Amino acid sequence: MFEDVFSDSGNTGNFDRGKKRRLTIIECGCDINMMIDLAKVADLVLMLIDASFGFEMEMFEFLNICQAHGFPKILGVLTHLDSFKHNKQLKKTKKRLKHRFWTEVYQDKVGLTHELVQSLISTYSTIDAKMASSRVTLLSNSKPLGSEAIDNQGVSLEFDQQQGSVCPSESEIYEAGAEDRMAGAPMAAAVQPAEVTVEVGEDLHMHQVRDREMPEVVEIRRSNCTNHCDLGDTSSYHTKVSTVHIMKKRNGGGSLNNYSSSIPPTPSTSQEDPQFSVPPTANTPTPVCKRSMRWSNLFTSEKGSDPDKERKAPENHADTIGSGRAIPIKQGMLLKRSGKWLKTWKKKYVTLCSNGVLTYYSSLGDYMKNIHKKEIDLRTSTIKVPGKWPSLATSACAPISSSKSNGLSKDMDTGLGDSICFSPGISSTTSPKLNPPPSPHANKKKHLKKKSTNNFMIVSATGQTWHFEATTYEERDAWVQAIQSQILASLQSCKSSKSKSQLTSQSEAMALQSIQNMRGNAHCVDCETQNPKWASLNLGVLMCIECSGIHRSFGTRLSRVRSLELDDWPVELRKVMSSIGNELANSIWEGSSQGQTKPSIKSTREEKEWWIRSKYEEKLFLAPLPCTELSLGQQLLRATTDEDLQTAILLLAHGSREEVNETCGEGDGCTALHLACRKGNVVLEQLLTGWTSWPEMPTGTQR
């Protein structure tokens, strides 16, 4: 369709719109990840879909994600190019589509810089399904219009059978008129405000309505749907708008949604002024009738209890239930739609807690007993109201997809201020190809199938959806506000892994710096080299890189070497290093080194290796044991009980495996390691585990 757009640059076309604006057109494949990435940075998305082959699953997923997260405006074009058998007709259709794109989308008539108010007027007629398909889209950027103002401007359209306006069968409505639907209705969302666009069959007429006042939403209800079209009559006739209802916006600004559907034209039999109101019949599913019928069918018990009392009962007992647990932020009865194919609504008791979890129970009794519950994690979920876009969405006119395509409700949210009334036996649709006209049998008791507008949805990151419904608009808005606040609070309380790692690295760096600042740690423990960067976990000392290589050659039994800058340092290892240090270690390992020359920075590797081997492996310079009648194992047990670190290190240096693992003569037979664990002394526990202690050795009571 836009072959000359991408002829020069492949899949991308760049066009200058002055010195400060530039339009970039990117052709995207049917890939869900690519479509989402481009939609995040785009202002407008134009979807060209071949309706003859149906929607792909990627299209449905893309529309669902766009509606849940407030992505940009989407203009959908259902193409039927394969249905054209003649090249001349195909070229003509492509030319019309191209013209509409460049004159309506490219020329900035979408309304990106000003508010675009659009209301859906056209619907399907259930009186005669064989009537010609037509579309009526009204855009108003003027003061409230009366029916005389619209009729006097001639919102009518002449068409005849020769132009393909009347289709002889139901199937041909979607096949023979493919060119008209493709070129007209899907692009109607791009028409400039202050225009009235009426399309029937092959022709497209626009009537200007000029004014400078604030925009208002105008809604038209057809009432002359009982007249039939004479398929054999070749004379032209007019489509008249019979009744006009002016609905003012209640919430001021905000973005409204775009809709598209079809309505068959009805020949006008009179040119008199239209009436301003049509009294609803008994079968008209007005909001009042629909709400009362819903309560009487779903919530009225067999004994004739009052539904208002049932609704107030959970609120009266909200403060007296759920003892022993945290008090929820909000709780009450809501309707929940089942996920099964029946799609039935059942009453659930729903609670919202401060931990970011929404829980629903089958009944109030289940909540009191804390059984049969299901939880929804709000930290990975978002909330959505059908027909109402998120507050962060900046779209001026946003599309709505059919409920059959994305599982969302078809009803509009009246909280936005736009109210749409439906005539008897009328159902809205968005795609003439996907939603065929309903049969007369399908319209029986259709008012019972009307969904309420008090519902909201919770969509998780995995795509799972929960549908809830409140009794009133106020209650629904209260739930939505509470859930949104809890989602925000939960996300703000969760620290990212990056920030956690930064905090951990900062605290670890400060702890290692404090270890280097200890007395004696400014020089190597064996050769007095300045600023050592390596450590021995068994000994609790710092050393230079050359001495660390010698320590490694002795194996991990003697010394486990670790770098201060390259390795991770858990809390327990940092405590060992900060508790011992070079000064304390040398007072033990060099306690009897009188007359021996300690290596220096200028000493050779052989001299350093001899000193380290004599000091740690042969223990030639080790301080003597204290004079006592107790065995080494009993002394180690007493030092562990008294938490005497210096004595414990000296005893560990002199002791063997059997002496270190000696148990208490009386009591439960605990070793020194067991006593250190009971005391909670991490330093002694690490030293005993690193030397010759046996952690798996059971106590005398087999614990």
UniProtKB/Swiss-Prot annotation:
UniProt superkingdom: Eukaryota
Arf-GAP domain segment(s): 509-629
Signal sequence annotation: none
Bias kind Polar residues: ranges: 271-286
Ranges annotated as C4-type zinc finger: 524-547
Residues forming coiled coils: none
Annotated SMART domains: ArfGap, PH
Keywords, alphabetical: ANK repeat, GTPase activation, Metal-binding, Zinc, Zinc-finger
GO MF terms, alphabetically ordered: GTPase activator activity; GTPase activity; zinc ion binding
All residue ranges annotated as the PH domain in the record: 327-488
Region feature Disordered, mapped onto this chain: 249-287, 299-323, 427-449
Record's compositionally biased regions (Basic and acidic residues): 303-318
Entry-linked Pfam families: ArfGap
Gene3D superfamilies with a match to the protein in the record: Ankyrin repeat-containing domain, Arf GTPase activating protein, P-loop containing nucleotide triphosphate hydrolases, Pleckstrin-homology domain (PH domain)/Phosphotyrosine-binding domain (PTB)
ANK repeats: 631-700
Purpose: Putative GTPase-activating protein.
Family: Belongs to the centaurin gamma-like family.
Misc. comment: Encoded by one of the numerous copies of centaurin gamma-like genes clustered in the q11 region of chromosome 10.
Protein name: Arf-GAP with GTPase, ANK repeat and PH domain-containing protein 9
Organism: Homo sapiens (Human)
